[in-house]
From Swiss-Prot:
Induction: Transcript accumulation reached its highest level in 4 hour old cultures. This is Secreted lipase 5. Secreted lipase involved in plant virulence. Has a substrate preference for p-nitrophenyl esters with a carbon chain length of C8 (p-nitrophenyl caprylate). It is found in: Secreted. Pfam families: COesterase. Residues 1-17 form the signal peptide. Optimum pH is 7.0. Its main location: secreted. The lineage of its organism: Eukaryota, Fungi, Dikarya, Ascomycota, Pezizomycotina. GO terms for cellular component: extracellular region. It is an enzyme of class 3 (hydrolase). It catalyses: a carboxylic ester + H2O = an alcohol + a carboxylate + H(+).
Length: 535
């Protein structure tokens, strides 16, 4: 898929590192980790942030490791690695149903929400780590308090995305607060991360490899973050969209050994997965791809082995092909997590209880949605789209359905968690800023809150005073939660969710020129019930 010219012009500025501005050899600040020795780079725009841009946490998943669980990366020796640009992303695939939406890049804001198609590889199981300079220097005898850690899991429908998304880079946030560390994780996507292959299923092998990648990355953080000045006992897992599903679902998968102490789920939750998990018995998608790769007509075991030897270039061409070029989009390839009742479950609603073997209700969750989620999933180029203030009637059912599903499953989960005695805080984001939502009808679309939290909201143009205030407050709120998941937001006046939805309260962000305001969930609950959603 081609990228817009503006993206091509901007990406080198964002992805390539400026020359180091520290008056020393950064090798003196190198950190010895379980997967190698890494020296930081310092950018002119964020001079007090030590950026470790390209750290592998797993072996390259090629050959026999393609379509297999990730293998921990081992320290290769004494060489110091000093990288000056972000890692190449995992191979991308934009499904047919998202072609023609803002996710397809017709406007720059939409383009900046997904990864760089031109720079992808299977050698992508990397993290990018951003820490205050002072925390990295602690090993020189300048003691600092261990910092809370936020591990970011990107969205993108398990098909696109990565670290190299300008809206989703954490340096500005860390530069401003100097009080936390952010680790951004890449994981395998689409056919390579979620291969519903019969050859795997027959042997009882896991089909949700991308989720196993995420877990291995969390283990890497636990084992290494203290060396960067981070607190391994204060790790919060944060994700949005598919990343929101992943981090919320993580609690169910790793209930007996979660490692993390808090979860932030933006516009995604485990209960919403119940309606979109794939059928573990339907292997036609993988076999169709295999046929296109010259591996058709084989027994399942042989099909899998053949696909493990397909050149990476061929896979990239197939997955990233434009419509009409005989690629995955033309084959109608769909990507979904598979309910195996090990990493993904089909009964999340039933599993939320006080039974810690099934669900760790002791881990607090901050969860929320946006007021116009569905604007991101409808065809954008309708008549008059450049000046319209709302969607045309024929597109509203699709947009409303997408948004209501997120809103109502979120309300349902907050109720179930409250019944289980779990600490839960809920937000509703309503921000509408022209440098993020340049078309009048977009509003607070799916992902629109992220530039505020990351502090990248000026990527597309200057901000307003209110937008800057909003960004700083959201950054502080997320950090308050990560610093003390049980009580941090409560100290800021946030109410905990209650077991009776009509009595529960949540916090509305960026609505009516107000930074935050507490309001009743009853109106949202009523809207769900009127549209047939159980909360």
């Amino acid at each position: 898929m081609h990228l817009k010219s503006l993206l091509l012009a901007a990406l080198p500025l964002l992805l390539e590192a400026s020359p180091t501005i520290k008056g020393e050899d950064t090798a003196s600040l190198a950190i010895n980790t379980s997967s190698g020795i890494f020296a930081p780079y310092f950018d002119r725009q964020q001079p007090n942030v030590a950026s470790f841009l390209d750290i592998p946490y797993a072996e390259t998943p090629i050959g026999n490791l393609r379509f297999a669980p990730p293998v921990e990366k081992k320290n290769a020796g004494d060489d110091i690695v000093h990288t000056t640009k972000l890692p190449a992303g995992c191979i991308q695939y934009l499904p047919a149903l998202l072609r023609g939406t803002i996710n397809d890049g017709p406007i720059t804001a939409g383009t900046f929400q997904r990864g760089d198609y031109a720079n992808t590889t299977e050698d992508c199981l990397k993290i990018s780590l951003f820490a205050p300079e002072k925390s990295v220097r602690a090993k020189e005898g300048k003691k600092t308090q261990a910092l809370p850690v936020i591990v970011w899991i990107h969205g993108g429908g398990y098909s696109v995305g990565g670290t190299n998304v300008p809206y989703q880079l954490a340096q500005n946030w860390v530069q401003r607060t100097q009080k936390h560390i952010v680790v951004q994780v890449q994981y395998r996507l689409n056919l390579l991360g979620f291969p519903n292959a019969e050859g795997l299923a027959r042997e009882g092998n896991n089909l949700n490899l991308g989720l196993l990648d995420q877990r291995l990355a969390v283990e890497w953080v636990r084992n290494n973050i203290a060396r960067f000045g981070g607190d391994p006992d204060r790790i919060t897992l944060w994700g949005e969209s598919a990343g929101g599903y992943a981090v919320d679902g993580y609690l169910f998968t790793w209930a007996q050994d979660p490692i993390i102490k808090g979860v932030i789920a933006d516009s995604g939750n485990a209960l919403a997965l119940e309606g979109v998990v794939g059928d573990s018995r339907n292997h036609t998608g993988f076999s169709l791809a295999a046929k296109s790769m010259g591996c058709g007509g084989l027994l399942p075991k042989d099909e899998l082995e053949c696909m493990r030897h397909v050149p990476e270039r061929n896979l990239k061409e197939y997955l990233q092909a434009e419509v009409g070029q005989g690629g995955a989009a033309d084959d109608g390839l769909t990507v979904s997590v598979i309910a195996d009742n090990i990493t993904v479950f089909s009964n999340y609603t039933e599993r939320i209880s006080g039974n810690s073997a099934k669900y760790p209700a002791n881990i607090p969750v901050l969860i929320g949605t946006n007021t116009n989620e569905g604007a991101a999933v409808v065809p954008y180029k309708f008549p008059g789209f450049e000046t319209a203030t709302e969607l045309p009637d024929q597109l509203k059912p699709l947009a409303d359905g997408f948004g209501l599903n997120l809103q109502c499953t979120t309300l349902k989960e907050t109720r179930l968690r409250a019944e289980a005695g779990a600490t839960t805080y809920q937000y509703l984001y309503a921000g509408n800023f022209t440098n993020i939502s340049p078309l009048p009808w977009l509003g607070a679309y799916h992902t629109a809150e992220l530039p505020l939290v990351f502090g990248t909201y000026e990527t597309e143009g200057p901000s307003t005073k209110f937008e800057r205030r909003m960004s700083e407050r959201m950054q502080d709120l997320y950090l308050e939660f990560a610093s003390d998941p049980s009580h941090g937001l409560e100290k800021s006046g946030w109410p905990r969710a209650e077991s009776q939805p009509e009595r529960s309260k949540l916090v509305k962000l960026a609505a009516d020129n107000k930074v935050e305001q507490v309001f009743s969930a009853k109106k949202l609950v009523d809207e769900c019930v009127q549209n047939g959603f159980a909360v």
